[in-house]
């Protein structure tokens, strides 16, 4: 019994290779303009025919396997409930359910509930399910089932450029004489290079003179119209993000006076990918303590908080919340600025919508000791949302953050109605008694404190 899945992968690779060869031969003939002699032309035609015949054989084998496979019933456990087809790249989400990566990613861009369990997902985390993948592979081999191979991405074809090749890309991006199309193509190649090769991330910043400023030149000259060439902007911001993941680059990038303002603009103006990668870059740069001060003193902090309050893009909002939490942890000045810039109302907006709940509660809990935040929490009527979350959540961290906010509300709010609301919650649902017996250490302390106060 031949390895059906391996054969399928080989067939797909053969098809791609043959199509590239055919395109090359045809392009050479079309571009030749009749310069070649007749013998060379005939050879080229023969080569094209050979490739076409080979392609026909490969495609017919593929169709036969697909026909054979169609008669075998795939176990429902191996099918994605979203696509109704066999899983190629199975991943586990926060609820413990497994889905095809492509389809669950698309789902989570619009809805943060589990498609099967219907529960709110407190974290957007996709973990490869190696066990189910191995089981599917074995079943396919045993049943001679042709499981589709994952579609190759652009990065699968990238080979590492030498130093002069990277310099050439930068020259094409930064040169005033380059067309937008050429700049875009060069920026895309640089984004792929920096994604795949750590050496390129290191070399670009360390060895190329004024490389960051030159990379940003096409966007800097556009000013407020930074998104007028969206594909170019996306590729440049993506390259920046890739380079920011290299530890030695973080400080250099943050200290360049053009980088953070550009990222702030790109969070407001740009494609979905651009906005998300700009946010991820700021989150990456905030790993360094000195960078937290730089970012906190810039327009980027407000841009992050504005993005949190928009609710348009779940992934970007999630990343912005994570970035703000990182910036405010152990950095009191950023904490104060975030409060004055409206972090509490932005986080509450997410909590009320039950979107990015895990991160929104973490952000609000972080700043909840401040009196202004307590007043905003009271004014926006989020207490009932918090109590509902406490009753329903099975996540200990979410429970801890929610009860911390409630505890701070009770301790600092001047509203007498808070005590009455909490007492009614305890009488009807025993919410705080349950937390006091089965929550985290911090949650237990807060719940016990609330119980003492409402029973006093």
Swiss-Prot record:
What's the domain of life for this entry?
A: Eukaryota
GO molecular function annotation: ubiquitin protein ligase activity; ubiquitin-protein transferase activity
The ARM repeats are found at 247-287, 289-329
The question of whether Cytoplasm is a record keyword is answered with no
Give the E.C. number(s).
Answer: 2.3.2.27
Swiss-Prot/TrEMBL keywords: Repeat, Transferase, Ubl conjugation pathway
Alphabetized CDD domains for the sequence: RING-Ubox_PUB
Q: Mind telling me which Pfam families this protein's record contains?
A: U-box
Give GO BP annotations, semicolon-separated. protein ubiquitination; regulation of cellular response to heat
The U-box domain extends over: 73-146
Cite the annotated pathway: Protein modification; protein ubiquitination
Recorded catalytic activity of this chain's protein: S-ubiquitinyl-[E2 ubiquitin-conjugating enzyme]-L-cysteine + [acceptor protein]-L-lysine = [E2 ubiquitin-conjugating enzyme]-L-cysteine + N(6)-ubiquitinyl-[acceptor protein]-L-lysine
Cross-referenced Gene3D superfamilies = Leucine-rich Repeat Variant, Zinc/RING finger domain, C3HC4 (zinc finger)
Q: What does this protein do?
A: Functions as an E3 ubiquitin ligase.
- Protein name per the record: U-box domain-containing protein 48
> What is the organism lineage in this UniProt record?
Eukaryota, Viridiplantae, Streptophyta, Embryophyta, Tracheophyta
